[in-house]
Amino acid sequence: MNRSRAIVQRGRVLPPPAPLDTTNLAGRRTLQGRAKMASVPVYCLCRLPYDVTRFMIECDMCQDWFHGSCVGVEEEKAADIDLYHCPNCEVLHGPSIMKKRRGSSKGHDTHKGKPVKTGSPTFVRELRSRTFDSSDEVILKPTGNQLTVEFLEENSFSVPILVLKKDGLGMTLPSPSFTVRDVEHYVGSDKEIDVIDVTRQADCKMKLGDFVKYYYSGKREKVLNVISLEFSDTRLSNLVETPKIVRKLSWVENLWPEECVFERPNVQKYCLMSVRDSYTDFHIDFGGTSVWYHVLKGEKIFYLIRPTNANLTLFECWSSSSNQNEMFFGDQVDKCYKCSVKQGQTLFIPTGWIHAVLTPVDCLAFGGNFLHSLNIEMQLKAYEIEKRLSTADLFRFPNFETICWYVGKHILDIFRGLRENRRHPASYLVHGGKALNLAFRAWTRKEALPDHEDEIPETVRTVQLIKDLAREIRLVEDIFQQNVGKTSNIFGLQRIFPAGSIPLTRPAHSTSVSMSRLSLPSKNGSKKKGLKPKELFKKAERKGKESSALGPAGQLSYNLMDTYSHQALKTGSFQKAKFNITGACLNDSDDDSPDLDLDGNESPLALLMSNGSTKRVKSLSKSRRTKIAKKVDKARLMAEQVMEDEFDLDSDDELQIDERLGKEKATLIIRPKFPRKLPRAKPCSDPNRVREPGEVEFDIEEDYTTDEDMVEGVEGKLGNGSGAGGILDLLKASRQVGGPDYAALTEAPASPSTQEAIQGMLCMANLQSSSSSPATSSLQAWWTGGQDRSSGSSSSGLGTVSNSPASQRTPGKRPIKRPAYWRTESEEEEENASLDEQDSLGACFKDAEYIYPSLESDDDDPALKSRPKKKKNSDDAPWSPKARVTPTLPKQDRPVREGTRVASIETGLAAAAAKLAQQELQKAQKKKYIKKKPLLKEVEQPRPQDSNLSLTVPAPTVAATPQLVTSSSPLPPPEPKQEALSGSLADHEYTARPNAFGMAQANRSTTPMAPGVFLTQRRPSVGSQSNQAGQGKRPKKGLATAKQRLGRILKIHRNGKLLL
């Protein structure tokens, strides 16, 4: 409710009066007055119209309204009047009747069955006598010089901060001899101020001069408290300067534009004048603002409650209850901390903390409120609570939504600037940006826009701002996910051991290591459980390389993961090391960590605690260390699975059996795929660079690593010098692929996937000029067949457990080496063929999985035709526009999906096949060469195992293949018999037909048929020409090959369409 409009009648607050009917007034009014009031309603003895800023009281006799200043009634005393009589009615009915008290306030409050009212003398006495949890458990006590933006960023400004001396805070204050009369002098005695009646917990208006008289009066009938005297626009503002940290963080100080049409919020400077026993009930500062208090004289006691979700819900229910002044909110929560702020001390209360204030002695203090970016989400949450509680505008942050729009625009600029400069925003800024964007969406919804559009600045384009901010947040979060596990706590600002030389003041019972600059001890340090070994190892792993040396007295920090895992895996034994263990880990170590058996023969290690005492930790025995090493290795491997939920797995190929556990149970490790060329975080290379608020001290670098390199940091040390797939290797590969001029480029090379795409586009653009040299063509043929070697070897190696260095290098990627007497003939042939292929590669680069041939490779190398035919299963071979159509070998075990056959295509193929069979029979009878007829008959007869198939497509010229090969190359060694024509119709439906003139095609991968691309290719064949010369008869044009004849029979148009 607006206090300036409050009107009191018999102690009750009433709305402004309605215009009076002047015809019913008493005869004390003159005719002149009646005529004047007929047009404009007037009141009181002064006959003035209604003034919203002046206090008025109603007469119970004549029902007229009078100004308190005109009839001599003060607003704070009006509540004690039972029946008020105006000066005119006083003559007829006597003086006003005051309320009758049934006894003293003490007896009234302590009456049986009557609850104690908040703010009453009894309430204050009971509050003084109660005990609360000490605030030393939660508050921080840095010096003024330590309280910087970096300090708050590291600790997120989530707990109160008490600075014992104002030195280093950078604020200006009057001398301790400054009094309330001096405040009146600088502000003015006529300044109207809001005053709280503590006993009634009600607000009233007073002039500052009247309050000063009350303050210095010998007898105070009431307890009045002034907590909302904002003096930014007075002369007192020149004597008070807010702390430097507040000026750096405040939104109003830094982001409110000078030319804004909205009124600038003035909430930075307040003067608090409180008499003894003043009490302010529990509240959250308006708009979720943080607040600073400096006690110039006297003392104040703060009762602090942490803003957890449960406590905020209880607070909202308590604030909306009808008997709020009969319940002490501190009794409803689990923890309520008591913090006493004495003269000369400064307290900073963070966003959302619920607090009440008691003044034990007369006190003069200064303070102020400010919004900041360290906890935007909590500020918005507090603002929503205010709206749900229907808090009056007078007690809310002025133009809160307006400043939020300006801040959203500012955060967007920060994100863009940092991204362009390859620098990272801090995590609190990202969370704040997300919370702001959600609030913007809620405020601009169609149904809610009328209530919020008045506070939207004209210079802000709301829709575009929401869209751009969401995009930047999405980009930043992608970078965050890519850097999880790669760097040690880059984006989270909570550090285990913040760097600093000056220790903070903390309770004596805290047992944190003296190196730590910040600790949040529990209420009872002896009851705090120590960390278990696994938790300690996880913390040490997250800490990474941030830990530094503790001191010269033999206190060294050490990376526990390096000590346990690396030494155990390399040598099997442990070196002596000193560990950085917090005091919490040492408390009750015998009870909470029974697994850590100590050997009394080992040399102890002394640790100096923050309280000056020493503790000795005995080294672990050799057998115990071996067990712990296994546990640590397991924990480290399981920690890699944290990334599982952050990324989408493309295929089952990412599932590998980790072989490092030996005889232990094999753990299924998920290797997440990371996109290439994403920004990575690296330590800032410029030590002189000034870090901006909201930025992390790390740069962004372009990453050119492959998927294997993303996990190389975890398993790289386990192998013996395995460097396959590293950055240097990939850069070399890029140079091999790019050609001789590629090294002259100034830009960084593209990733292998990009190079493969470039190769495909170049091949499509240079179809006629790609068959240049035999050497390059052999490389291309090897590339086509090499894919299936790697896939076959990976499938053969999957599921094997080996402790050899080779298997540790790339688990699941190498084939199993068998003794000579175990190998079959086909395996020996494959091994010999692979050796020949590797020899033919020459200087072409290759790594553990891939080969990177040059762009001039071709498939027409005659050297490849001399190699033995063997079955290839490279389904993932890259498409090449130069590749010939290769026969698809039957896959007996391949499941056929139901509903995938096209009836029209099947019917057409069946009819065409039948017609083809008849034509071939007729041609065979008319041919002069009798030698070919037995072969044709053999082909025409269906094989026994294919009798159950619906259709068999014969190709009569395939039988001539052995003879054609003999003319160009020697006979290959014998191998298992392959049948190019067997298989169901599903094997030939969507794939190319077998070719009788390409013997080397058996070494290639299966290529899917693409109408218009493969079937229309016409290439002259050396084998076909020799065959024609030997026969002495030249076939018709366009019918030289079986593919051409089949295309003619099936009526396949040259554009690749199948005409049925």
From Swiss-Prot:
Q: Which family does it belong to?
A: Belongs to the JHDM1 histone demethylase family. JHDM1D subfamily.
Name the segments for region: Disordered: 100-120, 508-534, 768-840, 852-902, 915-1046
Q: Which cofactors does it use?
A: Fe(2+)
Q: Where is the composition biased (Acidic residues)?
A: 826-839
Location, primary (coarse class): nucleus
Q: Which UniProt keywords are given for this protein, alphabetically ordered?
A: Activator, Cell cycle, Chromatin regulator, Dioxygenase, Disease variant, Intellectual disability, Iron, Metal-binding, Nucleus, Oxidoreductase, Phosphoprotein, Transcription, Transcription regulation, Zinc, Zinc-finger
Domain-related comment: The PHD-type zinc finger mediates the binding to H3K4me3. Binding to H3K4me3 promotes its access to H3K9me2.
Quaternary form? Interacts with POLR1B, UBTF, SETD1A, HCFC1, E2F1 and ZNF711. Interacts with ZNF263; recruited to the SIX3 promoter along with other proteins involved in chromatin modification and transcriptional corepression where it contributes to transcriptional repression.
Variant or mutagenesis effect after changing R943H: Reduces transcriptional activation activity
The protein depicted here goes by the name Histone lysine demethylase PHF8
Instruction: Please report the organism this UniProt entry assigns to the protein.
Output: Homo sapiens
EC number(s) per entry:
1.14.11.27, 1.14.11.65
Per UniProt, where does substrate bind?
Answer: T280, K300
Taxonomically, which superkingdom?
Eukaryota
Q: Where are the zinc fingers (PHD-type)?
A: 41-92
Q: Which residues are recorded with the post-translational modification Phosphothreonine?
A: T705, T706
Q: Where is the composition biased (Basic residues)?
A: 924-934
User: Which GO molecular function terms does the record list?
Assistant: chromatin binding; histone demethylase activity; histone H3K27me2/H3K27me3 demethylase activity; histone H3K36 demethylase activity; histone H3K36me/H3K36me2 demethylase activity; histone H3K4me3 reader activity; histone H3K9 demethylase activity; histone H3K9me/H3K9me2 demethylase activity
Name the job this protein performs.
Histone lysine demethylase with selectivity for the di- and monomethyl states that plays a key role cell cycle progression, rDNA transcription and brain development. Demethylates mono- and dimethylated histone H3 'Lys-9' residue (H3K9Me1 and H3K9Me2), dimethylated H3 'Lys-27' (H3K27Me2) and monomethylated histone H4 'Lys-20' residue (H4K20Me1). Acts as a transcription activator as H3K9Me1, H3K9Me2, H3K27Me2 and H4K20Me1 are epigenetic repressive marks. Involved in cell cycle progression by being required to control G1-S transition.
Which catalysed reactions does the entry list for this protein? N(6),N(6)-dimethyl-L-lysyl(36)-[histone H3] + 2 2-oxoglutarate + 2 O2 = L-lysyl(36)-[histone H3] + 2 formaldehyde + 2 succinate + 2 CO2; N(6),N(6)-dimethyl-L-lysyl(9)-[histone H3] + 2 2-oxoglutarate + 2 O2 = L-lysyl(9)-[histone H3] + 2 formaldehyde + 2 succinate + 2 CO2
